[in-house]
């Protein structure tokens, strides 16, 4: 019984990751004809690393119901620790 529950949890966790948004590069963004642009998202938070900022963009993309995102800006403008990130999102 315990192994069945464990197996079910593993399947659910793996399937949840397959629904995550996919980051695409410049070339892919220009050549995707079968997607609909949903606009641009902006995030200004105190992140320790660029990967944390990318994770936040991914989560916001998911929250907006988009499938793909293309990072258009990621920078730390001053010494205040806030990282500014923005991305085009697509469905």
Swiss-Prot record:
Primary location:
periplasm
Show the disulfide pairing: none
Member of which family?
A: Belongs to the BhsA/McbA family.
* Gene3D superfamilies (alphabetical): Flavin-binding protein dodecin
> Quick one: signal sequence residues?
1-20
Cellular localization per UniProt: Periplasm
Q: What is this protein called?
A: Uncharacterized protein YjfY
**Presence of the UniProt keyword Signal in the record:** yes
Gene transcribed to yield this protein: yjfY
SUPFAM superfamilies according to UniProt: YdgH-like
PANTHER family from the entry? OUTER MEMBRANE PROTEIN, OUTER MEMBRANE PROTEIN-RELATED-RELATED
Alphabetized, the UniProt keywords read:
Periplasm, Signal
Q: Which Pfam families would you find in this protein's record?
A: YdgH_BhsA-like (PF07338)
Task: List cellular component terms (GO).
Answer: periplasmic space
Q: Any one Gene Ontology biological process term?
A: response to stress
